[in-house]
Amino acid sequence: SEVVSFSFTKFNPNPKDIILQGDALVTSKGKLQLTKVKDGKPVDHSLGRALYAAPIHIWDDSTDRVASFATSFSFVVEAPDESKTADGIAFFLAPPDTQPQKDGGFLGLFNDSNKSIQTVAVEFDTFSNTWDPSARHIGINVNSIESMKYVKWGWENGKVANVYISYEASTKTLTASLTYPSNATSYIVSANVDLKSALPEWVRVGFSATSGLSRDHVETHDVLDWSFTSTLQAPSDDSN
């Protein structure tokens, strides 16, 4: 079987194994800061993404097999005005040559003109766009900015959120959970996702985030740590 596994307890300010896109950078303290901060304050119209450098084999056409994976990370979203937040952060899988898309509500993952962008994402969405439910939510997105499944999210300003996302290939189940250790609340959402029809055989995995498009709807998006493991079974693994 093919196994990819990596873990960052913090990030290197000059990362060799992370591709930074847009405004993303690693701070001197080892935080992955996806959107821009100036004089300690988040900036509007910011878009940043970070990808693990090595492409990952997510399914194999010759054997018809699909990988299972699990990832966990911690992040903080902090807003100067907690009644005005935008726009959110996502974990995503996309083709290896993936580039930042539209900012604002499109979370750097999608745009309104190209409807065929191959991207599977779990979004932590802090602003209700026209296509969104009316509250902050955690959504599963398959080749669309509109979530196919979502759960309401009681976002906590400036608090560390622990996320665990898993994909079980045998049942095609993508599950995401978010927990706030500070008040022991948690949220879970899952959906049936066929990675083989949604994505190419090889992908890159990573994060994308955008701040709002007006000066008063802004927030920070910082990833503190990240681990990931995927396993693509070889045909011989179960021949007997």
From Swiss-Prot:
InterPro entries: ConA-like_dom_sf (IPR013320), L-lectin (IPR016363), Lectin_LegA_CS (IPR000985), Lectin_legB_Mn/Ca_BS (IPR019825), Legume_lectin_dom (IPR001220), Leguminous_Lectin (IPR050258). Ca(2+) binds at residues 125, 129, 132. Keywords: Calcium, Glycoprotein, Lectin, Manganese, Metal-binding. Mn(2+) binds at residues 123, 125, 132, 137. Seed. Glycans are attached at residues 111, 183. CDD domains: lectin_legume_LecRK_Arcelin_ConA (cd06899). GO terms for molecular function: carbohydrate binding; metal ion binding. It holds the Pfam family Lectin_legB. Binds one manganese (or another transition metal) ion and one calcium ion. The metal ions are essential for the saccharide-binding and cell-agglutinating activities. Belongs to the leguminous lectin family. Homotetramer. Lectin that binds galactose. This is Seed lectin.
